[in-house]
């Protein structure tokens, strides 16, 4: 199975994110959204606009999203530890990290 992973804060979730999720899903058999916490967003931009649990509920209810997990990038924006977590969840599957957007902000 090919698992596509997209990570981010998605705060607030908007139509561009939804189009992005759909495009990412087309590259695999399963789409996992790795959602950053409120604390991570506060560190990145000073506050979270939409609480984690609300963002998670909205994203979980998109028909093309298979799973939403909590996810933390480090202080430098690296998501290596988070991707290692996902690989440990799916040790025998191909993982595709399909990120774009504001990774350098």
For each of these PLM feature ranges, what is it?
Residues 1-105:
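Nucleotidyltransferase catalytic core that binds NTPs
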